[in-house]
Every structure is written in C-alpha cells, then in structure tokens.
Amino acid sequence: MNEYINLTLENIDEEHICCAIGDKKHQAGVDSKKEWIKSKLKDGHIFRKLNARGKIFIEYEPLETAWIPISGKNYEYIYCLWVAGSFKGKGIGKELLEYAINDSKEKGKSGICTLVSKKKKPFIGEKKFFEHYGFKVVDTIGDYELLALQFDDSETPRFNDSARLMKIDNKDFTIYYSPECPYVEYEVNELIEYAKENNIKINFIKIDSLEKAKNAPCIFNNWANFYKGEFL
C-alpha cells in the first residue's frame, strides 16, 4: 500500500515539496513556496504527496481562497496533480485524485474543479485523465477549459471577467508571476539579469495576494506572459 503525507505546520520544514528536490539554484523558490503553503493552510489548503523522492503530489484548496481568476461557491480547486518519472502508470494519480474527491465530499463541498487545455501545455493537467472521473467542461477561454466534477445541482464555477480580457494596456514584455511554483523565483531572477545585460525592458508583476490573483487579466496558474498587450 502506498504511503502518503499531508503537509502541516508541524512537518513542512522537514518535508520536501516534490519539485526542485536537491536543486540549490531553486532553494529560494522552495523556501518561498513553503512560506506560501504555511500561509494558506488556514484556508484549508491541502498538499498531499507520496512518501517518496519525486514529483508525486496533488495540491488543492477551497475555490474561494484559491489564487486563480475563477469564482464559484463551495468548490475545491486543484492547482496541480503531478506524477512523474518511474511512478507513472502505477495508479498513484488515481489514488491522489480520489483522495481529493472524497475529501471534498466529506467536507460537504458542491464539487471540485481544475484548469486544463485543449492543447498540451506545461504544468497543466491532462483533460482526458480528469474526464475519466466524470469531470466536464463548464467554461472556456480560448484553448483553456475549466473542468468541474459536480456533487450536487448547484451553480458551477466560472472564469472571472478579468481573465477573459487576455490583454493589458502595457505594450512592453510583461510577466505576471506568483510564489505558488518553486521554480518561478529563479526564473524571474535570471530574466531580470538577462534584461539588464541586453538592455531589454521587461515588466515583472508579482501576484502576492488573493485579490490580485482573482483579478488577473488572463488565465493565471502561477505564470503569464504578455507582449504588445497580448497574452502569449
């Protein structure tokens, strides 16, 4: 039987968070992600991982407090479900998702939802996997789709109006980012240095609050690029 661990205030400092394990260049990002998780646990944030060294985890929380430009009542939102490498094909993804579904039902939720894409994109779940468990498309913006598994007849979640804009007024290259991903901090610092060395103007906008996340001008999980005002 597989052994899983849910991160808590008591164990998070000793546990790894699956991504960037042992990678010193991403340590600052790992530390930021851990602090972010600590701040979110009070909201019901769940980070559940296989007790192993690898990228094998699910991360979700109530949609009302999730840093994503999606709104809905009494739903859980899955940020990420990742099973990588040799752990694939062993039913671990199934166990992680079923845990989240059952946990949501036990909490009296109306359903659970997640972001996918019609086309394969990095760091976004596979649509077919979720559809196998009964998730259905409830809203769409371009190639991006909001999937939901309903437990009752209540209204399904929707993308916020701000996310439907998919554009900004600033015409310079602009990056929106958040501490939700441990890889982000290193990449931002690298881009800042690259921009300085090559005299390129890049605007960096940090999403560091629930309000900013809910009002993001595009589909936003933890990173978004704009150029000449258009979402890339």
Predicted regions and their residues:
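A conserved beta-turn-beta hairpin within the catalytic core of GNAT-like acetyltransferases
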Residues: 65-78, 88
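Short amphipathic alpha-helix that is part of the acyltransferase structural core
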Residues: 1-51, 162, 181-183, 187-190, ...
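Conserved catalytic-core motifs of GNAT/GCN5-like acyltransferases
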Residues: 115, 131-148
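Non-catalytic, surface beta->alpha helical segment in thiol-disulfide oxidoreductase systems
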Residues: 228-232
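C-terminal "cap" of GNAT-fold acetyltransferases
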Residues: 7, 142-165
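Conserved GNAT acetyl-CoA-binding A-motif
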Residues: 104-120
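Conserved acetyl-CoA-binding loop-helix of GNAT-fold acetyltransferases
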Residues: 83, 89-104
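Conserved beta-strand in the GNAT
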Residues: 49, 53-64, 77, 82
